[in-house]
Design a protein with these regions (language model features):
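Transmembrane alpha-helices and adjacent helix-loop boundaries
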Residues: 1-323
Length: 323
């Protein structure tokens, strides 16, 4: 293993160790820990949305729908299906099932993307978000518009950090693979990509599935942190917040996704004294970003740590000296 990879794995292990040890040691107060968990959940959401909106160049505005599906499925499992004693040991599996349910919904949404792009796809995904919210509001077993509660507080800083690292690792490997080059080709020119034998339908399908899966996982983490969810938590306003984080950090950038999520989450918390007015900040920031800096802070740029290692230089051939 190269020195660079050793540093990456060492950094990941250090983050996990701190996420495990700091809450137990009492070095951080519960308020700071909760903010860090919200930052991590938003990082997962932003990374997943950036795969579709940034790397593939589509414009999806219904990501909160996937988050809501994952949140409700995971919550039903821990409240109504699993015995209480099994909830904590099964929590990783619960999150995966919630993510898988969201991925199935992503499969449904991916089909309109085969024929529509830009504004038309935005309308389709917006309609999907509204449908999910409406369906959740009209299922009495899920609490209807009043919401669903009773979930155990299983989300910890360690689990959030672990999923952030896993999401980042998987997406980093994907975007620098043939898959990543394929979805980038779709972003640049889908017609040309089709002509060069890129299976655009298959790549779009996979991109939506992966993006929706991680949004569903983030929803499960969110539900078991807040211990209460309602359909309004996954409205178009939540999707707008995700768009702000993506375009603030920068499209087509893993580093930008992390920065955008951290900056926006902390900023909203600092503006808490403004009350309801702080929710104006997200839409306003999105408008200003689209006008003055549509590429975001790190648009199409990446920190060296997340870039693939450069190939080793070929050994120089020894001169031929003849027989």
């Amino acid at each position: 293993m190269s020195r660079r990879n050793w540093l990456i794995w060492l950094g990941a292990a250090t983050v996990l160790a701190l996420a495990w040890g700091l809450p137990a040691s009492g070095a951080l107060n519960p308020y700071v820990i909760q903010i860090l968990m919200y930052v991590g959940i938003n990082m997962i959401l932003t990374l997943s949305l950036n795969l579709v909106n940034g790397y593939m160049g589509e414009f999806s505005v219904g990501h909160a729908g996937f988050m809501g599906i994952g949140a409700y499925v995971a919550s039903v499992l821990t409240v109504a299906v699993l015995p209480p004693a099994w909830a904590a040991p099964a929590f990783p599996a619960v999150l995966i099932v919630g993510g898988a349910a969201a991925a199935v919904a992503g499969l449904v949404v991916s089909y309109p993307s085969f024929r529509t792009r830009g504004d038309y796809l935005a309308i389709v995904t917006l309609a999907f978000n509204m449908i999910v919210k409406s369906v959740l509001e009209n299922i009495p077993a899920l609490g209807g518009p009043r919401g669903y509660l009773g979930m155990p507080r299983l989300t910890t800083l360690f689990w959030v950090a672990a999923w952030v690292i896993l999401t980042l690792w998987i997406l980093r490997n994907l975007v620098y693979s043939n898959f990543g080059r394929g979805i980038t080709a779709i972003r640049e020119d889908e017609v040309a990509a089709n002509l060069t034998s890129v299976d655009t339908r298959r790549l779009k399908l996979y991109a939506f599935l992966i993006s929706a899966f991680f949004a569903g996982v983030a929803g499960g983490l969110y539900a078991h942190l807040l211990q209460f969810i309602n359909p309004r938590s996954f409205s178009i306003l939540k999707s707008t917040d995700m768009l702000v984080m993506v375009y603030l950090g920068g499209v087509g950038s893993l580093t930008g996704s992390l920065l955008g999520a951290a900056i926006f989450t902390v900023l909203l918390e600092l503006l808490r004294p403004l009350g309801l007015w702080r929710w104006v900040v997200g839409p306003l920031m999105l408008v200003l970003l689209m006008i003055f800096r549509p590429q975001g802070l790190m648009g199409f740029k990446e920190a060296g740590l997340f870039k693939p290692a450069p190939p080793a230089p070929a050994a120089a051939a020894s001169p031929w000296r003849g027989p």
